[in-house]
Amino acid sequence: MKYRIFKMKYTLLFLSVIALVHIFAVEAKDEPESDALVPQERGCLDIGKTCKDDCECCGCGNVCYCPFDWFGGKWQPFGCSCAYGLKYVCAHKQKKCPNV
């Protein structure tokens, strides 16, 4: 008898957790996606986001870093991403980029 009550309690607890997870999943789907900003709509990209130019990265000292930037050009087989730059980057970006 005790085993049956014990089993029933844990079954109800498990079903309650499943129902709670389902409710949060449904609420997440119902939120409008129009409020979400697309990276192109924002003025700049955060650290770690894929970029093509220094001007796309947020902040005065952040740069578009290409770890495998071979031959000095912007040919990057593995892509570039926004990263923290050095102090002189800020002066360079202010000359180059209108949005800094």
Curated annotation (Swiss-Prot):
Note on domains (UniProt): The presence of a 'disulfide through disulfide knot' structurally defines this protein as a knottin.
Domain of life: Eukaryota
Organism in which the protein naturally occurs: Phoneutria nigriventer
Job description of the protein: Probable neurotoxin.
Disulfide bonding pattern of the chain: 44-58, 51-64, 57-82, 66-80, 90-97
Presence of keyword Secreted: yes
Family named by the database record: Belongs to the neurotoxin 09 (Tx3-6) family.
One Gene Ontology term of the molecular function aspect: toxin activity
Signal peptide feature range: 1-28
Name of this chain's protein: U12-ctenitoxin-Pn1a
Keywords linked to the UniProt accession: Disulfide bond, Knottin, Neurotoxin, Secreted, Signal, Toxin
Keyword rRNA-binding annotated: no
Prodomain positions: 29-41
Predominant location category: secreted
One Gene Ontology cellular component: extracellular region
Protein's cellular compartments: Secreted
Tissue localization of expression: Expressed by the venom gland.
